Amino acid sequence: MTGIKDVLYVRFCVTDLQAQQKFLDDFGFQTRIDDGLLMARGTDGSPYIYLAEEASEPAFVSVGFAAESEAALRDIAAIDGTPIETNPLSGGGLIARLTDPNGFSVEVVADIADSSLLTVAGRSGFNDGVEKQRLGERVAFAAP
């Protein structure tokens, strides 16, 4: 049986969506808020790696995994008889929403269209505990 190929995103509830967006922007993510959902992406082709919606209490909502294929998604969804739906987020594809044994939401998606890669300028300065040399710049590290 095929299965999961990667962790795709995490989803949270936050008490202040704009403050969270600023934090992520300063951290170097590319962000946007669309219909009350904060979406953040890195420099790779994934249309989002972090999702957040506003709520009265901060909370972990779910983790999203990328299935190896639509067939793998269907196999995984069949384990619990979970319906497969059209993914309403950027990149489209299909999604199955499951619940793990501890009650946490797990989303498994397939066939999400990649976004274009984001270019990263030369080496950026590093932030430390005293001085912030890099605000709002994305940083990518080359693999060794």
Model-identified regions with their sequence ranges:
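N-terminal beta-strand motif that seeds the catalytic metal site of vicinal oxygen chelate
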Residues: 1-18, 60-63, 121-144
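Core segments of cupin and vicinal oxygen chelate
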Residues: 2-48
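Short, structured motif recognition centered on aromatic/hydrophobic residues
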Residues: 7-10, 24, 29, 40, ...
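Vicinal oxygen chelate
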Residues: 15-18, 35-36, 64-144
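Conserved short beta-strand elements that form part of the metal-binding/catalytic scaffold
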Residues: 29-61, 105-112
